[in-house]
Design a protein with these regions (language model features):
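Acyl-donor (CoA/ACP) binding surface of acyl/acetyltransferases
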Residues: 1-48, 71-202
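Active-site rim helix/loop that mediates acceptor-substrate recognition in acyltransferases
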Residues: 53-75
């Protein structure tokens, strides 16, 4: 984790929660959300592309308790349909300007219940989270990565305006597929603002 274990992630300290979009509501995840999130994260078709897939309820409870502070939940009509990850990190800089690189970029991730697919919910939620990163947290760069074979995930990155910055051959060891390719996408804060301005003109 990019932040110290005993530190509260900056996004949790914002006063904007719960954040409402056209159809959804986003809010920081709580320990009590673990039961609902288990239902879709434990599915084989979902766990296929996750960095960790709980082997049983005990494993899930232990890991979720350790990680939930970095997550938000996405609700539709009061029901949780997915979760988002938001982690901030430092950029790289030469020693003389290193102080200007602290906590200036964010890494995003997401998981949605299969029945929520194909309705634009993920796009709506991720766009809202990018706006939070840029306008509320002052991030200058937002990144997201995926297994190259997880096309729905990187297609989502493209829909929200991220550009593919790298394609790495056999860089990651998948539990079932062996060594597989990976992709990295990113968008800068200025690019995000330009995208919003362009859409507002349409």
């Amino acid at each position: 984790m990019s932040e110290q274990a005993d530190a509260t992630p900056a996004f949790r300290q914002l006063s904007i929660w719960p954040l409402r979009t056209e159809r959804l509501m986003l809010r920081p995840a709580e320990l009590s959300d673990g039961e609902v999130l288990w239902r879709h994260r434990s599915l084989p078709e979902v766990g296929m592309w996750l960095g960790w897939h709980p082997v049983d309820r005990e494993d899930w409870n232990e890991t979720y308790t350790a990680k939930y502070a970095d997550y938000l939940v996405v609700e539709l009509d009061g029901e949780i349909i997915g979760d988002l990850m938001l982690r901030t990190s430092d950029g790289w800089g030469q020693r003389e300007v290193k102080d200007q690189t602290i906590a200036v970029q964010a890494e995003l991730g997401w998981t949605f219940a299969p029945e929520a697919g194909g309705k634009g919910y993920a796009t709506e939620a991720v766009e809202a989270l990018i706006s939070v990163c840029v306008e509320q947290l002052g991030m200058r760069r937002i990144e997201a990565g995926a297994f190259a074979e997880n096309e729905p995930s990187w297609r989502l990155m493209e829909r929200v305006g991220m550009r593919r910055e790298s394609y790495s051959v056999k860089e990651s060891l998948h539990r079932d597929l062996g060594w597989v390719d990976g992709v990295l996408y990113a968008i800068l804060a200025d690019e995000w603002r330009e995208r919003l301005a362009h859409h507002q003109k349409d």
